[in-house]
């Protein structure tokens, strides 16, 4: 009887050496995001972080999200360096809705076969997103799972924790009729609606590399999600923000009501901004109704902010000075009975 061939973890499809090489590659990206509250170094069993001392009654705010099927396009077109920014943006933009300053971020990268260069590119993007939002990339997990994912396909998840002063939590309770609504421009579809986007590409048989207003269509579609943290936190510090809505999955119809009292509705002037060309392309080539566009996509608006009408001019000036494209998009009105909480006129 012959002796069985000795087996290793690598024979089963898991390369520990590749994982170690990845950790070594991303050290500089992690170091760039360091905050003084972070204790210890990368690689511990748990990541430690103190609360900033400036808070008298700190409340932790947490969030988790992914990039969705935008990853399919990124993988197909070998554009891995910006999906990490998307991942961070989807989490930190949720946290600032409640007035929280992002503290730290963790990522989960799962793949069938670990390609060190691809994973390094992705995590460097995560580091860039953390740098833009001022939060520390404090840890993560890389899972090589042969048989669970096809080849070098991968999926991402992100987890973020922030902090806000208890007295300064923004929860929508101050919203009242007469408040103004300010919109912050998105950079494109951000990270939502990509299953429909891919369906439009399939049905229309469009070439993703075709020119669209001086840029390839695929470049419009893979534009990273805008991170609003620094500009919005500055606005919160200097103005009286009553509520904010991060326009993600569910678009206008689903996200705005999440931050409104039951007796309030948002009345939005649909002509107050111009849709970016990529949304017009999707609407036309997918024969998508106006209602479905607003239900699926951000249509050029990544964040909506409710604040007193007399604060609008100062808020717009501050946001534009911070690098945002911002405009007055509508107002809050009283809601009668079972009226819809979002009206686009």
From Swiss-Prot:
Catalytic activity: 2-formamido-N(1)-(5-O-phospho-beta-D-ribosyl)acetamidine + ATP = 5-amino-1-(5-phospho-beta-D-ribosyl)imidazole + ADP + phosphate + H(+)
GO cellular component, one term: cytosol
UniProt key word Cytoplasm: yes
Keyword presence, ATP-binding: yes
Sequence intervals crossing the membrane: none
CDD domains found in the cross-reference section: PurM
EC identifiers of the protein: 6.3.3.1
Protein's cellular compartments: Cytoplasm
Classification via Pfam families: AIRS, AIRS_C
GO molecular function (one): phosphoribosylamine-glycine ligase activity
Pathway in which this enzyme or protein is active: Purine metabolism; IMP biosynthesis via de novo pathway; 5-amino-1-(5-phospho-D-ribosyl)imidazole from N(2)-formyl-N(1)-(5-phospho-D-ribosyl)glycinamide: step 2/2
Keywords for the protein's UniProt record, in alphabetical order: ATP-binding, Cytoplasm, Ligase, Nucleotide-binding, Purine biosynthesis
GO biological process: 'de novo' IMP biosynthetic process; adenine biosynthetic process
UniProt xrefs under InterPro entries: PurM-like_C_dom, PurM-like_C_sf, PurM-like_N, PurM-like_N_sf, PurM_cligase
Family: Belongs to the AIR synthase family.
Name by which UniProt lists this protein: Phosphoribosylformylglycinamidine cyclo-ligase
Species this protein is from: Shewanella denitrificans (strain OS217 / ATCC BAA-1090 / DSM 15013)
């Amino acid at each position: 009887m012959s002796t069985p061939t000795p087996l290793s973890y690598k024979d089963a499809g898991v390369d520990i050496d590749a994982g170690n090489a990845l950790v070594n590659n991303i050290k500089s990206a992690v170091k760039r995001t360091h905050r003084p509250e972070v204790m210890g170094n990368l690689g511990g069993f748990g990541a430690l972080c103190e609360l900033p001392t400036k808070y008298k009654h700190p409340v932790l705010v947490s969030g988790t999200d992914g990039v969705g099927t935008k990853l399919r396009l990124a993988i197909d077109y070998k554009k891995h360096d910006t999906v990490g920014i998307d991942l961070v943006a989807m989490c930190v933009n949720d946290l600032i809705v409640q007035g929280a300053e992002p503290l730290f971020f963790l990522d989960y990268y799962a793949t069938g076969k670990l390609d060190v260069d691809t994973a390094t590119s992705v995590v460097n993007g995560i580091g860039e997103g953390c740098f833009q939002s001022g939060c520390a990339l404090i840890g993560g997990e890389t899972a090589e799972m042969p048989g669970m994912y096809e080849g070098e396909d991968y999926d991402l998840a992100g987890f973020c924790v922030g902090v806000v002063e208890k007295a300064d939590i923004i929860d929508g309770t101050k919203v009242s009729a007469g408040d103004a609504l300010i919109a912050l421009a998105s950079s494109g579809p951000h990270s939502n609606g990509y299953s429909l986007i891919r369906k439009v590409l399939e049905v229309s048989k469009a070439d993703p590399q075709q020119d669209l207003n001086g840029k390839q269509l695929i470049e419009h579609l893979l534009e990273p999600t805008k991170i609003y943290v620094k500009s919005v936190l500055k606005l919160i510090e200097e103005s009286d923000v009553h509520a904010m809505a991060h326009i993600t999955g569910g678009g206008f119809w689903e996200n705005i009501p999440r931050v409104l009292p039951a007796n309030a509705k948002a009345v939005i002037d649909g002509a107050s901004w111009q849709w970016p060309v990529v949304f017009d392309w999707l609407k036309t080539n997918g024969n998508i109704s106006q209602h479905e566009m607003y239900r699926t996509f951000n249509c050029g608006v990544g964040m909506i902010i409710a604040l007193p009408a007399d604060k609008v001019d100062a808020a717009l000036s501050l946001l534009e000075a911070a690098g945002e494209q911002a405009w007055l998009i509508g107002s809050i009105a009283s809601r009668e009975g079972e009226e819809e909480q979002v009206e686009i006129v």
